[in-house]
UniProtKB/Swiss-Prot annotation:
Widely expressed. Disulfide bonds join 217-288, 326-387. Glycans are attached at residues 270, 277. It comes from the Eukaryota. This is Tapasin-related protein. Interacts with peptide-free HLA-A*02-B2M complexes or those loaded with low affinity peptides, likely facilitating peptide exchange onto higher affinity peptides. Interacts with MR1 in a ligand-independent way; this interaction may stabilize MR1 pool and facilitate ligand loading and dissociation. One of its GO terms (biological process) is negative regulation of antigen processing and presentation of peptide antigen via MHC class I.
């Protein structure tokens, strides 16, 4: 969010102060009133022709400001003291182009997310580019210009696309912008009016295989515009397909079970799509495209399908050393992490190296399976081996353990060897003592003298 430093600081301090207070009873959303507030965003103006709804990586871009004028925002106590955008009567060579956009004709449902993004530790990506009508229906259209702004709030925030039409209320002989060649207002802004917006609440969705998902997409349009069509398309790995379409009151599902509520579509501008019983074929980028009698805009939502792994640990063989096999089955996507840990009784757990893996297997559903094998060293008293599996579908790694004991035959052999060592040691000790006693008796025997 591109507030001037003083405004940004004031807003964040106000939010912090509101959060730090402890009122007797906090007002509910229904009790809170909406207060008209200017939302100011740092943007880039893209000066080359581009597709609707796409962001430029780099190239011909220049700095810009987007000022959404008097947007109704729920007042949580943090808006007190926030001043409206004043603009500047001086236009410098390196000053950013300022788009002043009225939102009187449409609703901005994600206004709070845009306003408080900076204070929430998030960022807003904003790009503005020229918008070209599909067909010019009136001669007066030739005297206007259109722009489309695409805004995304980071870390799972909403995404908004708005079509803005320039207003013709600039004074005769007004200063014109050097790049756009458009007349500027007395405050040095390009005055526009938002006539159409399309919003999605979440940029990326992760859902489990077999579950259901609702892909959010909503819109708001100015009076006089008619809704002509809604299309949901899926793009994945270079191919695209139509999932659902709605035109002039008729809906058609190309994907089995896909539904869109026509009453909500017409009453509240809710074009959300529901998909039941997700399969891996449902994974990809979903494009919600809304068409009106004059404008068209879209939102893109990536949907990731997840399948958590199931693990099982078993003993493969016992001779000469036991082998442990950890079977990991039914997971998606492909990447999985396997860690082996060994722990003796009363010892410190240690990671085991040298594990081998089987070839990767894929089921008819598209999920993956693999096995990991390690040679187990039970030691003299046994050891516990743990197979730990990490996957993107899991909040915490899965673990399974098995205690491995020494082979009974090996223990018997060791016992015989140990007993033999004790016997030989005792025998040697006995012989040594016997020899020592014999030597002592010879040295103490009386000597005979000849005479």
């Amino acid at each position: 969010m591109g507030l001037e430093p003083s405004w940004y600081l004031l807003l964040c301090l106000a939010v912090s102060g509101a959060a730090g207070t402890d009122p007797p009873t906090a007002p509910t959303t229904a009790e809170r009133q909406r207060q008209p507030t200017d939302i100011i965003l740092d943007c880039f103006l893209v000066t080359e022709d581009r597709h609707r709804g796409a962001f430029a990586s780099s190239g011909d871009r220049e700095r810009a400001l987007l000022v959404l004028k008097q947007v109704p925002v729920l007042d949580d106590g943090s808006l007190e003291g926030i001043t409206d955008f004043q603009g500047s009567t001086e236009t410098k060579q390196d000053s950013p182009v300022i788009f002043e956009a009225s939102v009187d004709l449409v609703q901005i449902p994600q206004a709070e997310a845009l306003l408080h993004a900076d204070c929430s530790g998030k960022a807003v990506t904003c790009e503005i580019s020229k918008y070209f009508l599909q067909a010019r229906q009136e001669a007066t259209f030739e005297k206007a210009h259109w722009f489309i702004s695409n805004m995304q709030v980071s870390r799972g925030g909403p995404s908004v696309s708005m079509v803005m039409k320039t207003l013709r209320d600039a004074e005769v002989g007004a200063v014109r912008h050097p790049t756009l060649n458009l007349p500027l207002s007395a405050q040095g802004t390009v005055k526009t009016q938002v006539e159409f917006q399309v919003t999605s609440e979440t940029q990326t969705l992760n859902h489990l295989l077999g579950s259901s998902v609702s892909l959010h997409c909503s819109f708001s349009m100015a009076p006089g515009l008619d809704l002509t069509g809604v299309e949901w398309r899926l793009q994945h790995k270079g191919s695209g397909q139509l999932v659902y379409s709605w035109k002039t009151g008729q809906g058609q599902a190309k994907r089995k079970g896909a539904t869109l509520e026509p009453e909500e579509l017409l009453r509240a501008g809710n074009a959300s799509l529901t998909l039941p019983n997700l399969t891996l074929k449902d994974e990809g980028n979903y494009i919600c495209q809304i068409s009106t009698s004059l404008y068209q805009a879209q939102q893109i939502m990536p949907l990731n399908i997840l399948a958590p792994p199931k693990i099982q640990l078993h003993l493969a063989n016992k001779d000469p050393l036991p082998s442990l096999v950890c079977s990991i089955a039914g997971y998606y996507p492909l990447d999985v992490g396997v860690t082996w840990i060994r722990e003796e009784l009363g010892g410190i757990p240690a990671q085991v190296s040298g594990a081998s893996f089987s070839s990767l297997r894929q089921s008819t559903m598209g999920t993956y399976s693999i096995s990991s094998t390690v040679m187990a060293d039970p030691g003299p008293t046994g050891a516990t081996y743990t197979c730990q599996v990490a996957h993107v579908s899991l909040e915490e790694p899965l673990t399974t353990s098995m205690r491995v004991l020494p082979n009974p035959e090996q223990r018997g052999t060791l016992g015989v060897i140990f007993a033999s060592i004790i016997f030989l040691s005792a025998l040697l000790l006995f012989l040594g003592l016997h020899r020592q006693q014999a030597s002592s008796s010879r040295s103490t025997r009386p000597m005979r003298h000849s005479g």
